[in-house]
Amino acid sequence: MCIRDSIKTLPYPGFPTDMQPQIAVALCLAEGTSVITEGVWDSRYRYVDEIHRLGAQIQVDGKVAVIEGVDRLTGAPVQACDLRAGAAMVIAGLAAHGTTEVDQIQYIERGYEDIVRKLSGLGADIRVVVTPEEEKAQASVG
């Protein structure tokens, strides 16, 4: 179980803004209320709508996100809207009960080399599924 916390992202050597979406996933499963204050960037909470699909309870007001811990996340289709949000969706999907499908994985693949192989090597049940539409699009490009 994760312990609730309050975090404020800051420039180095403070808590890194690039880790904010991933830590938010952990705090979604913490007991109680946690608060994240984004002290570096505007619009860093774009992932929140996606993680809501998994059952997370996050309310955003400006640069502050209030997270109410839930007992479990439940698998659902989600999208990676950027690199860090994509990593957060993968983490949330691995923690969720049931299947989570992450779309727009090009963001994740751009920033995390061999992430599927590495996570599988750690025991994660994760794989890339290419849809017929994606296969057709790839064939027409190459």
Where are these regions (language model features)?
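Short, structured segments at the rim of ligand-binding sites
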Residues: R4-G142
